[in-house]
Each structure stands twice: as structure tokens, then as C-alpha cells.
């Protein structure tokens, strides 16, 4: 194990410290990469509407960095006074805003350029192309300094509305009117959420009333970097929870404190990531939040303290939350947690977490002793008892002493990350991971993440029967987007052309201009070719002079998965039936449901329906499940409220709308007669209201009865 020392630093205590070429580690043979036979192609190329996107800077705040760059020398205090994310935090939301069956793309922007809504024209044009309709749809938000966003059907109208977050200002709630237009109901709804640095948001029905509430991750005043650099939480802002009070144009009330979510004792954390997910699969939507360690030494190094955690707020099913982070074992994993994705990565039937982090290629920070593995982007695995196992167990001095997986699934080291998505990009039936990101701050920008695509090696390659193994696939690095130079924040996944392959959309706050320098760190990782852009060079203790490197406005990439291995897939969209069927509880999007898919002969995949995760972004709510060479599979949905439904004989290539049937096949209290009556009555109502076809209702009825009979067999 290697601990790199202070003499190896170009920079100093910061969000970003890059290493000079003289600082190196012993050469190791890098881990092998894999070619899964899948290709990606970036279609946001010159001449397209997508290529016109440019992320706008934050205005006067950005000018501080510009002015510093013109000076002969600057000091650490000058860096501290610079804004955080001075080029903003562009978020990506993939959603079908007009219900035409094709996924559209929303990308936030800054005060000098409008946000974009890229309408997918495939249904009318017959080919994949996009047009920016933000202005006519009412989503341009001119002059608004936007960060992340999330979307959901807040009034159960059948259309997804969108919530866009403000930087050091209030948020905007845009109600989808169902006619291609959004109405700004921010003030009338009470959803402004005050003047905070709102970063990420997520929607979920926390109180179990069939309405989507909104949880917001807040950071600190982004006009300067004091929250990171001054080693104090005094600058941090508490997170928020807005409860949906109902109505066609819903009103919201702040229940942040009364719900138990916005814990401020002793002080709030600096939160980057948030997600509403039924983590324990009990029918109740919990909240997972990621906070940042910042420039504070970890406890194991004898000072400072641990403050950056994956925090879990467990829901009592009525909207009251308890912070169970310690009880589930996550206080042993401090870090700079920045983005979340969820899946059954190790095939044990539990929902586990992948968290992006500072990575292994930017350490150590000046004066902060660090070991390989402390800040790895990595998976945190849920055990059968509801606690979590960290393969790196960073409270131990060395990962190997935890008895876990010191090789981190064979990758050894992982790069920096912001946005992340769990997806089965090669449709082999195993959940993979894609993430991206770069930190631009202080004396440079890191370029260690070329576009990370981690292929899950499957159930036969588990380590110690529990820890998954992953291989790096360079397919994203080779798609033409040049993600290594793009300072990516927003990442979202969805099938944009309905071809059965999950695509990726990434938004960058900036693009690096100038020579990238190799930092010569070698861990035996496929990411050992890490680089950085020097914007300043050290000329003494706490003194720096400008270097040639700089950044320019960020871009958008739409990275289309072209397949290539012949594997099959199926797609599913959940349809909650509250207000449509007596006894139904699930919101119209089915947000909070957990969908399981078991292809014939393969393990079960789990994909929770999450309206806002990653970093400042949101995946499509339409889920794509890989099937390998299987031709059939079984879908199972655990709905908010705890009802379970099944559909057998799902065929390869099918696109299923799965409605909530408010009668659980696992309910031991129901007779066959009562259960049959409930199923048929519910499906008849859904057919009558045009939500499912008669033929699909017959399939769901047959499957429901089969599932009930199987679950009630003696023994």
C-alpha cells in the first residue's frame, strides 16, 4: 500500500490537488480492460441542435477566477475566496414530457443562457433527432442560475412536471399542463425552498398518500469555498423536504424538521447527492444522501473527524424519518460522496449503492494523510440483514485489514466522479455502472476519468461469494465525446431510440483547454493513465502563478448505445393506479416501486424507480432490462405500500406498461375468490379508463392467479 507525501504536490489543501510528474508510485501491470462488443457514438456533433448547448458561467462570481488568472501571483486565501462551481452545475433529466413514447432531454443552464428541452422527434421524423423547444414549452427559464433538476407527476395527471434548482436562490416548479407547455407555479405552490445552494433533488411519496413529495440536497454558499477550505461545517446549509398537499396545481409545505429529515445537530453536512428509494424493500420510500468530507482529516489519521457519509434516512411509511446511518454500518465509510446509483450488483436480492467519490488519483491533499482506497468511487453492498458492507472499509488503515475486497473488484483504483447511472449496457443480465466527472478548482482540473464504464463480470465472478467484480470497458472513452477533457457533472441513462439499449446523456460545466499532463501514478488500475490540466503552478509556500491551461464553456454529449453483441432486452414502465382503482396507493409514475426482472436461466436484476439520483440529474423512468440470449423472463413489481404483482412470459423486445393491481399475490389473508375478484375488478377499471388494453389485462390476470397459486402452495 502506498501513501503519497506532501513533496509530490503541485497544489495544496483543496478540492483539487494535482501531482507533478516527479511524483510516482512503483510501476504495476495495469488491470486488463474488456471489450464487451458494444459501441457508443456521440450524436451531439457540429451541425446538430444538441451541439449548440453551452453551459453559461455564473456571472459576477466567475469573474473572481478570471481576475485571479490575470494576476502575477495569488495565495491560498485567494483560492478560498473563489466561488465553487463557477461554471455552474448542469443537470440532466431524461423524461417523456409529451407522452409520445420517446424520451426527451432537459438540461439546465446559467443566467446568461436559457435551459434546454430537447424534444425527441423520432416519432414524427422517423429517425433520432432532437429540437430545442424550451422556449415554447415554458422551460427556458431565462436569467435563472440553475443547478440540478428532477421530474415526476406531482398531480397524478399522467404528465411529468419538473423541479429546477437555483444556485444561491429559490427553485422553480414547472407544472406540465399536458399540452406541450409548462406553467411556472413556484410562488403559488410554495416550492421556492428559500435562498440556498440547492444541488440535487429527488421525488418520492414519503407519507404514503399517493402524492410525490420533493427532497432537496443543499450544499453551502457557493460564492466562495470556505465550507471546504476552512474545515468547518458552519457554512453548510440543511437539506429540505417539501410535502405535497394535493390539488391539480399542488401546494407544498416545508416539513424538513418535523419529518426528522433535516438533521442539523451538531451541524448539517455539505450534501451533493440525494435519492428517494425503497432501500429495504418494505414498500416505504427512504432517503439516501451523500455528504462531503472536504478538507478535513479522517479520524483514523488522528485528527479532524469524519463528516462525509452516505446517510440513510429510514421512513416509517408515514413520512417520519430516522437517521440509521450508524445502525446500517455506513459510519465506517467516510468520503466525499457525490452521486448515487442503485442495483443488485452482487445478485443477492438486495438493493446496493454505488457512490461516486473523489477518487484515488488526486490524493493526498496537502497535510491530509491518505491511503489508496480512502476516497474510491465504489459499490457499498447491502447484506441480508439490512446492513452494508464496504469493500474498502476505509476506517481501517489498509483495506486488506477489513477482510473485504482490497482489489475493489479487480480495479484496484477508481477515478473521480460526479454523475452516475446503473444500467445493463451490454444486456447480459448483470447490472453495470457508468459514471463521469472532473473537478475544476484552485490550481487546475483533473482529467483522470475518460468516461468510466464498468462491466459487471456476473455471478460466477463474485469475490468471496459476495463482492462483485468489474472490468473497465473503454467504449465510452472511444465514442468521440472526449469525456476526459469535459468537466462533466450531470449523467443520466435512458433508451432514447427505443432499440432496447440504454443510452447516456452527459452535461459538462466546462471543457479543458491546453496540455494535459500525466501524473505518473500507478496502482495496477485501468485508469493509471490519469492526467491533469495545470491552471496554476506553485512558486513557494502558499503562492502560485498562472499557467497556460484554462477552461471554456461546457458541452452536452448524447452517447448512443449501438449494441453489437446480439443480446436481448425488455423494457417496463410502471403505472401507479391511485385515483384510478379503489385501494390503489401508488403515484401515477410508480416512483418508489422496485422492479425485479428474471430472464430465463439468469439471476434477478433489481431496478428501483427513482425520480432523481445520480448527481443533479435523473434517469428515464422507463427501465431497460438485459436478457442475454434468453427469450423470456418474469417481471415483479414491489409497489409503494407493499403490494407485489407479477407478470410471467415477458418476451424479448417487449415494452411493457405494468399497472398497479392493489391486491398482492403474497397476501396470506386473502382467499382465492377475493383475490381473483380484486385482480379482475382492478384490471377492468384500468381497461375502462384506457390505461391498459384488454389483451394485456388478460395476461396480467393470468399471471396474477398463477403467482397467487404458487405463493400459497403448502410448505
Predicted regions mapped to residue ranges:
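Bacterial N-terminal signal peptides that target proteins for export
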Residues: 2-12
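C-terminal motif of bacterial Sec signal peptides marking the signal peptidase cleavage site
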Residues: 21-22
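Blade-edge motifs of beta-propeller repeat domains
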Residues: 28-86, 119-144, 175-196, 228-269, ...
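Beta-propeller blade termini
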Residues: 89-99, 119-120, 145-156, 175, ...
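Short, conserved, GDST-rich strand-edge loop motifs in beta-rich repeat architectures
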Residues: 217-236, 290-307, 356-374, 436-448, ...
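Acidic/hydrophobic-patterned starts of short beta strands in beta-sheet-rich repeat architectures
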Residues: 99-109, 156-165, 208-217, 281-290, ...
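Gly/Ser/Thr/Pro-enriched helix-cap/hinge segments flanking short amphipathic alpha-helices
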Residues: 388, 465, 469-482, 501-515, ...
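Soluble extracellular-acting proteins and domains
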Residues: 661-715
Amino acid at each position: 500500500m502506498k501513501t503519497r507525501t506532501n513533496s509530490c504536490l503541485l497544489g495544496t489543501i483543496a478540492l483539487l490537488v494535482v501531482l507533478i510528474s516527479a511524483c510516482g508510485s512503483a510501476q504495476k501491470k495495469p488491470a486488463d480492460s474488456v471489450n464487451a462488443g458494444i459501441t457508443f457514438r456521440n450524436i451531439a456533433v457540429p451541425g446538430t441542435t444538441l451541439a449548440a448547448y453551452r453551459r453559461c458561467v455564473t456571472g459576477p462570481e466567475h469573474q473572481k477566477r478570471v481576475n485571479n488568472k490575470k494576476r502575477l501571483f495569488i495565495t491560498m486565501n485567494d483560492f478560498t475566496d473563489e466561488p465553487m462551481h463557477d461554471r455552474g452545475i448542469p443537470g440532466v433529466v431524461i423524461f417523456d414530457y409529451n407522452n409520445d413514447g420517446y424520451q426527451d432531454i432537459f438540461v439546465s443552464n446559467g443566467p446568461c443562457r436559457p435551459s434546454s428541452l430537447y424534444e425527441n422527434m423520432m416519432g414524427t421524423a422517423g429517425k433520432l433527432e432532437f429540437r430545442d423547444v424550451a422556449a415554447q414549452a415554458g422551460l427556458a427559464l431565462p436569467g435563472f442560475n440553475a443547478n440540478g433538476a428532477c421530474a415526476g407527476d406531482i398531480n397524478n395527471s399522467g404528465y411529468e412536471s419538473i423541479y429546477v434548482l437555483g444556485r444561491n436562490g429559490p427553485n422553480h416548479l414547472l407544472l406540465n399542463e399536458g399540452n406541450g407547455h409548462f406553467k411556472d407555479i413556484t410562488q403559488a405552490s410554495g416550492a421556492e425552498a428559500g435562498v440556498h445552494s440547492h444541488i440535487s433533488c429527488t421525488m418520492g411519496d414519503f407519507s404514503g398518500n399517493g402524492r410525490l413529495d420533493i427532497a432537496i440536497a443543499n450544499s453551502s454558499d457557493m460564492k466562495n469555498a470556505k465550507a471546504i477550505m476552512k474545515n468547518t461545517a458552519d457554512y453548510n446549509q440543511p437539506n429540505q423536504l417539501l410535502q405535497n398537499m394535493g390539488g391539480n396545481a399542488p401546494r407544498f409545505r416545508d416539513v424538513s424538521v418535523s419529518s426528522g429529515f433535516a438533521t442539523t445537530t451538531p451541524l448539517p453536512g455539505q450534501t451533493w447527492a440525494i435519492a428517494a428509494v425503497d432501500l429495504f424493500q418494505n414498500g416505504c420510500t427512504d432517503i439516501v444522501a451523500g455528504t462531503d468530507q472536504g478538507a478535513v482529516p479522517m479520524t483514523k489519521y488522528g485528527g479532524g473527524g469524519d463528516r462525509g457519509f452516505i446517510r440513510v434516512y429510514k421512513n416509517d411509511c408515514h413520512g417520519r424519518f430516522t437517521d440509521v446511518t450508524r445502525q446500517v454500518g455506513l459510519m465506517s465509510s467516510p468520503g466525499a460522496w457525490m452521486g448515487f446509483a442503485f442495483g443488485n450488483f452482487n445478485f443477492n436480492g438486495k438493493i446496493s449503492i454505488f457512490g461516486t467519490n473523489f477518487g484515488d488519483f488526486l490524493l493526498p491533499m496537502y497535510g491530509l494523510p491518505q491511503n489508496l482506497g480512502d476516497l474510491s468511487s465504489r459499490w457499498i453492498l447491502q447484506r441480508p440483514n439490512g446492513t452494508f458492507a464496504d469493500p474498502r472499509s476505509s476506517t481501517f488503515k489498509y483495506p486488506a485489514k477489513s477482510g473485504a475486497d482490497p482489489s475493489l473488484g479487480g480495479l484496484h483504483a477508481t477515478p473521480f466522479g460526479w454523475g452516475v447511472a446503473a444500467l445493463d449496457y451490454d444486456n447480459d443480465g448483470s447490472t453495470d455502472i457508468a459514471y463521469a466527472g472532473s473537478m475544476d478548482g484552485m490550481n487546475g482540473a483533473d482529467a483522470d476519468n475518460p468516461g468510466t464504464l464498468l462491466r459487471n463480470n456476473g455471478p460466477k465472478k463474485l469475490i468471496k461469494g459476495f463482492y462483485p467484480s468489474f472490468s473497465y470497458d473503454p467504449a465510452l472513452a472511444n465514442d468521440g465525446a472526449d469525456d476526459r477533457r469535459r468537466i462533466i457533472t450531470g449523467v443520466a441513462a435512458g433508451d432514447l431510440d427505443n432499440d432496447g439499449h440504454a443510452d447516456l446523456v452527459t452535461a459538462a460545466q466546462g471543457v479543458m483547454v491546453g496540455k494535459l499532463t500525466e501524473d505518473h501514478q500507478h496502482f495496477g488500475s485501468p485508469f493509471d493513465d490519469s492526467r491533469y490540466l495545470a491552471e496554476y503552478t506553485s512558486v513557494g509556500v502558499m503562492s502560485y502563478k498562472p499557467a497556460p491551461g484554462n477552461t471554456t464553456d461546457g458541452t452536452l454529449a448524447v452517447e448512443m448505445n449501438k449494441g453489437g453483441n446480439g443480446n436481448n432486452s425488455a423494457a417496463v414502465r410502471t403505472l401507479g393506479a391511485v385515483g384510478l382503482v379503489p385501494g390503489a396507493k401508488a403515484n401515477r409514475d410508480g416512483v418508489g416501486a422496485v422492479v425485479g426482472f428474471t430472464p430465463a436461466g439468469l439471476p434477478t436484476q433489481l431496478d428501483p424507480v427513482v425520480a432523481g439520483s445520480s448527481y443533479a440529474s435523473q434517469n428515464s423512468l422507463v427501465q431497460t432490462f438485459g436478457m442475454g440470449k434468453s427469450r423470456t423472463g418474469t417481471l415483479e413489481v414491489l409497489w409503494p405500500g407493499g403490494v407485489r404483482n407479477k407478470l410471467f412470459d415477458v418476451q424479448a423486445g417487449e415494452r411493457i406498461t405494468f399497472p398497479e393491481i392493489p391486491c398482492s399475490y403474497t397476501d396470506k389473508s386473502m382467499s382465492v375468490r377475493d383475490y381473483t375478484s380484486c385482480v379482475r375488478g382492478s384490471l377492468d377499471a384500468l381497461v375502462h379508463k384506457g390505461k391498459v388494453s384488454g389483451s394485456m389485462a388478460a395476461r396480467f390476470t393470468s399471471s396474477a392467479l398463477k403467482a397467487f397459486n404458487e405463493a400459497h402452495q403448502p410448505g
